[in-house]
Amino acid sequence: MIQYVSAHDDLTLWDKLCASLAASSLGSAVAEGDEENTVDVPKALHDADFSEQGLDAVGPEMAQALRDVLGANRLSAGIVLTSAGIPFMLSGEEFARTKYGNSDSYDSTKELNWLDWNRAWHMRDLIGFYAKLIALRKSDARWFDGNRKIVDTEGDELVFRVGDYLVAVNPSDRTGVVDVAAAAVEGDSGEMHRYWCCLGVSGRGVASAQGEVTTII
């Protein structure tokens, strides 16, 4: 089973998220006419500067749109790289590769299709996030084909356990609370649920373990 959220065909992940999340809230739409393969997205979303100075320069509405897209990008990576099967990535996804909304760029200019290493430098924090997920996956073969125990939740959260790891995905902007004791499996010590530690979070998220519950934002 191949797991992916971007490939050489269609929009890049970053462009998909810009079009579906940020562009709609900022009043952009799919382009028409001769640009049928292009999604019209504000240029600032593509040429993002995620330094605090860069975000301040684009104004609060655009800055929030950028943060939302980045958070969704990280969430997408987290889902793919903790899923069973074989993860697949478009080259450059790890630094938010953009083709400026072009979904069919096979006959476009080399400037549109090449990998922008300056962008990679500016998005190095996102690269670091991908690198940590990849290292985590490579450290335990159970990410590939291990059993997954699903933990019931009251909201939209997806929570499952793989080996000694608990993955909690919260796609909403509401705080979710998970009973980590419900993730116990045969062979756990009676107090194991008290010793979970947070290895990483995506987007604006915060995850903290206290006693028998984990809060995910």
State what each model feature region is:
Residues 1-181:
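Loop/helix patches that line or flank the sugar-binding groove of alpha-linked glycan CAZymes
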Residues 173-217:
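C-terminal beta-sandwich/jelly-roll accessory domains of carbohydrate-active enzymes
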